[in-house]
UniProtKB/Swiss-Prot annotation:
SUPFAM superfamilies: P-loop containing nucleoside triphosphate hydrolases
Organism in which the protein naturally occurs: Lactobacillus acidophilus (strain ATCC 700396 / NCK56 / N2 / NCFM)
Binding site for ATP: G13, M14, S15, G16, A17, G18, K19, T20
Alphabetical list of InterPro entries matching this protein: P-loop_NTPase (IPR027417), RapZ-like (IPR005337), RapZ-like_N (IPR053930), RapZ_C (IPR053931)
GO MF, any single term: ATP binding
Keywords: ATP-binding, GTP-binding, Nucleotide-binding
Protein name listed in UniProt: Nucleotide-binding protein LBA0691
Function: Displays ATPase and GTPase activities.
Binding site for GTP: D63, L64, R65, V66
Family of this protein: Belongs to the RapZ-like family.
Source taxonomy: Bacteria, Bacillati, Bacillota, Bacilli, Lactobacillales
Length: 293
């Protein structure tokens, strides 16, 4: 329809988190992609796009290579939306400090704020993370690429930004193991390490929460049932508030020690219950570590 707003996807986030890979993936998905656009040119660029019928899916990649420009990004986005001619969606790519350091060492490159090579890698990364906090808080989608392969990252993009009509709000329930690091893209993190652990039951230890024996052991414990009821009540109270605030995707992470038994079981049940009202995806971050070949 002629009066329908065009969609603008802004890709930003930590240097080294995968913006170049995402740009290529979006091109494969039919997006017109512009890389390294200074935020101060966003308004002029969008005027050109908006006056053309040749571009329907547009993405711009903006990073911190020019620090002075980056501080204008939120102002430019707000100005565009206030003028009413665009609906901007911000995709923020992140990764843990350890992963970013490893990636920089592998490529022998430096982050933008590494003080011209005189500062420590980690200092530059942490300063960049501090500067990007406001735009991260404003983002519609946050993707942690720390543990994603390029194939998994592309599939996540397809699931989120494909041409198929998407629900305005969706939930991702994720299980993880604290020993492998907390997921930095989670909105809500629940620690279930206090629940009885099947790891100490020899006949259950080799299996995961996807196995009925492990699932039943975890979920049938009285302390699990008391906790789970309160967790579900809390989420059913909170989720409408997230929707009211314009949240498009809510990521709920359930963590135990290794991400094998308890967190997987709780995540499975939670996804099952929440899917009665909302579109839900479920991810078991550590499951490939434990699936028997």
């Amino acid at each position: 329809m002629a009066d329908e707003k065009k969609q603008l996807l802004i890709v930003t986030g930590m240097s080294g988190a995968g913006k170049t890979v995402v740009a290529h993936d979006l091109e494969d998905m039919g997006y017109f992609v512009v890389d390294n656009l200074p935020p101060t040119l966003l308004g002029s660029f969008w005027d050109l796009i908006n006056n053309s019928n040749d571009f329907h899916k547009v993405a711009v990649v903006i990073d911190l290579r020019v620090k002075a420009f980056y501080t204008d990004l939120l102002d430019e986005v707000n100005s565009l939306e206030d003028n009413g001619n665009v609906q901007a969606t911000i995709l923020y790519l992140d990764a843990s400090d350890d992963v970013l350091v490893a990636r920089y060492k592998e490529t022998r490159r430096l982050p933008p704020l590494a003080n011209n090579g005189k500062g420590r890698l980690l200092d530059g990364i942490q300063e960049e993370r501090r500067i990007l906090t406001p735009i991260k808080n404003r983002s519609n989608y946050i993707v942690d690429t720390s543990n994603l392969s390029t194939k998994e990252l592309k599939q996540k993009l397809i699931n989120t930004f494909s041409d198929k009509k998407r629900q305005p709000f969706s939930i991702e329930v994720m299980s993880f193991g604290f020993k492998y690091g907390m997921p930095i893209d989670a909105d809500i993190v629940m620690d279930v390490r206090f629940l009885p652990n099947p790891f100490y039951i020899p006949e259950l230890r080799p299996f995961t929460g996807l196995d009925k024996r492990v699932f039943d052991y975890v979920m049938n414990k009285e302390e699990t049932q008391v906790f789970y009821k309160k967790l579900l009540d809390m989420l059913e109270t909170a989720i409408p508030g997230y929707i009211k605030e314009g949240k498009e995707k809510l990521t709920i992470a359930i963590g135990c020690t290794g991400g094998q038994h308890r967190s997987v079981s709780i995540a499975q049940q939670l996804a099952r219950d929440l899917s009665k009202k909302y579109p839900v995806d479920i991810t078991h971050r550590e499951i490939s570590r434990y699936i028997r070949k």
